Amino acid sequence: YEIKLHGKNGCMAYRKGLQSGVRKQLGFALKDISEHLPGAFIIYRADKEDDELFYANNEFLHMAGYKNVDELFQITKKSFRNLIREDERQQIESSIWEQIDNGNENDYTHFHLRKADGTYLSVLDHGRIVDSQQYGRVFYVLFMDWEEMHIHYGDKLLG
């Protein structure tokens, strides 16, 4: 079972100390994790011209008021930039790409996220750029509701 944690169709010679307890990790399906993780996230194409949205978990849809992923894709035209308030778009996209172009695999930014009803939610965005075999370069992005963070963490955010 240990070899399964490193991908399908693998093999490994037996060696003393292989952990059978690792089997527990195999019981969690990606869908279970993405739908029950206490965090809103999306996945989108990491391309300055074509930032196509691929995925949003239920936590993101709920936080932003979208009924389902189809409504999200329709309203945003499947584009990440259409989630950013228009007057912030250029500055936020520049900030993200400047961080990546400077050799960082993570980016951090704060902006106003477009909700399904057209209102905006102040969010912290923590993105990571990765190479996907299937989609090429993509961003995995976690979102935190800025106001909720201040309510729950208050002064702890300041250090």
Predicted features along the sequence, with ranges:
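Cyclic nucleotide signaling catalytic output domains
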Residues: Y1-H6, M12-Q25
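PAS/GAF/H-NOX family sensory domains and closely associated sensor/linker modules
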Residues: V69, K78-I92, E98-N104
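Per-ARNT-Sim (PAS) sensory domains and their PAS-associated C-terminal
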Residues: D87, Q91, D101-R128, Q134-V138
